[in-house]
Amino acid sequence: MIKIGSHVRFRKPDYLFGAIQESLENKANAAMIFLGPPQSTFRVKPENYKLQDYQKHFFKQIPPEDIIVHAPYIINPASPIKAQFSNDFLVKEIEKINYIGAKFLVLHPGFFTSFTKEVAKKQLISSLKSILEKTKNVILLLETMSGKGSEMCANFEEIVEIVEAVESPRIGICLDTCHVWDAGYDLKNFPEFCKEIRRTRLINYLKVIHLNDSLSPLGSKKDRHANIGKGFIGLESLRKIIFDPLFANIPKILETPYVDNKPIYDQEIALLLKKV
């Protein structure tokens, strides 16, 4: 089954109900939300989410397991300085996700800044173990990154090493096509790309795909998303991810730029699903 959706707006007054309504208007059967501003840890109380309205009207069209939650960008679980704040926040975030009944929380692995990469890697593994010990049900998904600055997890071997070191069924990977392209993985050579995903065992942990084109050339380490078919990856390669059996049943989530201050996810979803 093809599962496809986009980042949708989780905002007052309708929050979850409004977000899933927007997804359905885009002809999607999956969705991704932030539970607050992406650059902030501010959160409203779960009783404001309009959960019952969602359950009454949209539960069957987009069930909770196909609602992906993304953690805010500002947390850094790989930092020995910021890990405690990040971990405490993520524990509370997972409690809110449990309230919704969603299954996956995507998070950026973090940066190594004033400390070594090895220190950051050990801290990240420790953080993930601590969060999982204090929570239930939700699966944490580390996102593949572009390698900008001192980002963690810009290559498949590293992200798989970290996931396997956590030793939990509640840890997995979210692959972002723009990020891995910018990190140097050539999606245009699709057979080789799939071979690399298998070789590194990343496929064993892959639970969600962020499907984005890239404004930047291969290996640029820029992390600049483009609309589908308007970047260097191209429509043909991204469409292969939709239809290839290797990625069947994995939710594909678009995070592409607005056009004229409006999302065009409905157009992009239709474009991707069109068989040529």
UniProtKB/Swiss-Prot annotation:
Keywords: DNA damage, DNA repair, Endonuclease, Hydrolase, Metal-binding, Nuclease, Zinc
Names of the cofactor(s): Zn(2+)
SUPFAM superfamilies: Xylose isomerase-like (SSF51658)
HAMAP family linked: Nfo
Residues noted as binding Zn(2+) 3 in the record, renumbered to the chain: 179, 223, 225
Recorded family membership: Belongs to the AP endonuclease 2 family.
Primary role: Endonuclease IV plays a role in DNA repair. It cleaves phosphodiester bonds at apurinic or apyrimidinic (AP) sites, generating a 3'-hydroxyl group and a 5'-terminal sugar phosphate.
PANTHER family assigned to the protein according to its UniProt record, in alphabetical order: APURINIC-APYRIMIDINIC ENDONUCLEASE, ENDONUCLEASE IV ENDODEOXYRIBONUCLEASE IV
BP terms from Gene Ontology: base-excision repair
Annotated residues for binding of Zn(2+) 2: 143, 176, 210, 255
Identification of the protein by name: Probable endonuclease 4
Positions of transmembrane segments: none
Underlying gene: nfo
GO molecular function: deoxyribonuclease IV (phage-T4-induced) activity; DNA binding; DNA-(apurinic or apyrimidinic site) endonuclease activity; phosphoric diester hydrolase activity; zinc ion binding
Cofactor binding notes: Binds 3 Zn(2+) ions.
EC number: 3.1.21.2
Pfam families, per database record: AP_endonuc_2
InterPro entries linked to this entry: AP_endonuc_2, AP_endonuc_F2_Zn_BS, Xyl_isomerase-like_sf, Xyl_isomerase-like_TIM-brl
Known catalytic reactions: Endonucleolytic cleavage to 5'-phosphooligonucleotide end-products
Naturally occurring in which organism (per UniProt): Mesomycoplasma hyopneumoniae (strain 232) (Mycoplasma hyopneumoniae)
Binding site for Zn(2+) 1: 70, 108, 143
